[in-house]
Each structure stands twice: as C-alpha cells, then as structure tokens.
C-alpha cells in the first residue's frame, strides 16, 4: 500500500532536498506540483534524478495552470476555472501539453487536473464543450502513453463518470478527493467511491465541511474533524480492490503543517491496517 503527500516544488534547485524530506518522513510516493513558466527537459532530468535517488514514486503530476484567475469559490469559478473557461481555457490547454511532456520525462504515468465545473445536462452546449476539451487533452496524453486524472469535486460523481465515458479515450480516470465533494456541496466521498469504482486511480486524503454561503466553498478541516466518513470510504475502496496511492493533501497553511501531515500518516496507516 502506497502513502504519499503533495510535493510543491517552487524552485528546481530545491528538488533534492524536497524528495529527501519525503523519504525522511516515511512517504513512498507523491503528487508533484511544479508550475514553471516553461517546462524543460533539464528540469525533468533534475526532478527524476532526485526522485529516483530517494526512491520516491511520482504517482502523478498535478498540473495546475500558470495563471491565478481561479479563486476556488462557487461563483466566479464557473466562468474562470478549468480548461472550459472561455477566457483562459485555450492558454491553459497549451500549458497542460507542456506539462504532459514533462510528466513523461520524469517517469510518471498520470497527469492530474482540475478540469473545471461540469454541466449536469448532457444535452447542453456547456457539457459538449467540456467533453471535447477533455478529449483533446486526453488524446494528447494518450499519444505519450499517459493517463489523464480528473480531480473530483466540481460535479456530482455520476456526472464525472458520464463525462469519462463520453470522452471515451480509455485513458481518463478520477482522482477521488475525499473533501472536495463535500466542500463543493455536490456529493460525498462514500457515494463517489461506490459510483466511480475502478475509475479511481488515486485518492487525496483531506477533510472538510459543507458550504453554507452560496458563493463560497466549505472549509477544509484537520483530518477526522470534518464531514468525511473515512472508515466507510476506505471500506468501499477496499471492496473496489483499491490499494493506493493514498495522498495526504493539506491546504491549511500554518506552522504545524509538517507535524499535522505526519500525524495524519500515522492515523491513516492504523485505519487501513485494521
């Protein structure tokens, strides 16, 4: 069973220390977040060498967007987030294609993205646009031998499954974020684990609360202090024969972050070995 966390690499010269720190803290894998102005082969070589030396598997490149127009809310992000943004989508897809080559060069098989909000109505123009855009990215990745993982949250689980089936390239899967579904107010991870089944390639371990303000996401909490029913989530994942990677994600930024992640890892191992 594989356990990891996020590795947010801000400067390429920090790669060796960053991967060594993961090894020191008993992680065997990570989701890499690296968003340079331009992806280069040399940067990929440095990252791969650091990961290999420390025996850390890069389970996915979490390919964000270079811009900062996404606000992570339930209002402006319907227009501004994701690859389906009329204003920013085209530029983001081109950046993702750079990221895909980088992912190939660092040795991972998976590129993970926030695609954007997905329309419920399969006959709507918005839904058709999203299918076509995801297909464009997925086909580009498939030519490189890569999978596209869609982060859960901005749609109900059954809508995400429909989208994956309608794209139909065979290399599109889901990353189940246990808190996002609750924080977006669009579902819960127990149902999602059941609905998505073997489409789940990785899981983000995160806890949170439902939204109460119509324009704002629910709040993230510490592990086991929110609305996520982790024992039931893990039970359903076990029934699906999912064996990891489990990636601890903590977006709460404070001085106790490293300690809290270490504590979550210990709790997680105990729960999954029970």
Feature-to-residue mapping (PLM):
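N-terminal small/glycine-rich loop or linker at the start of catalytic domains
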Residues: 1-6, 60, 64-81
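Short catalytic-loop micro-motif centered on adjacent basic/acidic residues
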Residues: 4-6, 30-34, 147-151
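Active-site acidic/histidine proton-transfer and metal-coordination neighborhood
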Residues: 13-17, 53, 70-173
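Short, well-structured secondary-structure segments
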Residues: 28-34, 57-61, 109-113
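Flexible loop residues that form catalytic
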Residues: 35, 66, 116, 153, ...
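Alpha-helix-loop-beta-strand connector modules within alpha/beta enzyme cores
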Residues: 48-65, 131-144, 230-233
């Amino acid at each position: 069973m594989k356990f990891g966390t996020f590795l947010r690499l801000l400067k390429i010269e920090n790669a060796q220390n960053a991967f060594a720190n993961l090894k020191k803290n008993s992680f065997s894998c990570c989701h890499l977040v690296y968003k340079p102005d331009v992806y280069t082969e040399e940067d990929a070589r440095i990252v791969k060498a650091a990961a290999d030396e420390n025996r850390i598997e890069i389970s996915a490149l979490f390919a964000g967007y270079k811009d900062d127009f996404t606000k992570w809310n339930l209002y402006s992000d319907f227009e501004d987030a994701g690859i389906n943004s009329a204003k920013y989508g085209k530029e983001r897809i081109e950046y993702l294609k750079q990221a895909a080559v980088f992912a190939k060069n660092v040795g991972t098989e998976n590129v993970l993205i926030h695609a954007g909000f997905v329309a419920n109505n399969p006959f709507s123009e918005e839904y058709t646009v999203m299918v076509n855009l995801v297909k464009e990215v997925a086909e580009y990745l498939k030519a490189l031998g890569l999978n596209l993982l869609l982060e859960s949250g901005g749609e109900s689980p059954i809508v995400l499954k429909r989208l994956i089936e309608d794209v139909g390239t065979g290399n599109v899967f889901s990353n189940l974020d246990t808190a996002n579904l609750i924080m977006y107010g669009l579902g819960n991870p127990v149902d999602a684990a059941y609905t998505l089944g073997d489409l789940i390639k990785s899981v983000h371990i995160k806890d949170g609360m439902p939204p109460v303000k119509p324009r704002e996401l629910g709040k993230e909490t510490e592990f086991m202090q929110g609305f996520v029913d982790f024992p039931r989530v893990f039970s359903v994942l076990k029934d699906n024969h999912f064996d990891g990677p489990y990636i601890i994600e903590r977006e709460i930024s404070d001085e106790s972050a490293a300690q809290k992640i270490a504590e979550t890892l210990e709790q997680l191992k105990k729960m999954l070995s029970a």
